[in-house]
Amino acid sequence: FLAKNVAKKLVSHVAKKQLE
């Protein structure tokens, strides 16, 4: 189950958006 990987990617994506 890749839910953890997906969650990590989502968090990383959101974090990047917040940094801009």
Curated annotation (Swiss-Prot):
Family: Belongs to the cationic peptide 04 (cupiennin) family. 04 subfamily.
The keyword Secreted is assigned to this record: yes
Top-rank taxon, per record: Eukaryota
Modified residues (Glutamic acid 1-amide): E20
Any one biological process term the GO annotation gives: defense response to bacterium
InterPro entries hit by this protein: Cupiennin
GO cellular component, one term: extracellular region
Record's subcellular location: Secreted
Pfam families per the UniProt record, alphabetical: Cu
Keywords: Amidation, Secreted, Toxin
Protein name as catalogued: Short cationic peptide-4d
Any GO molecular function: toxin activity
Species for this entry: Cupiennius salei (American wandering spider)
Major localization listed first in the record, in broad terms: secreted
Glycoprotein as UniProt keyword: no
Free-text tissue specificity from the UniProt record: Expressed by the venom gland.
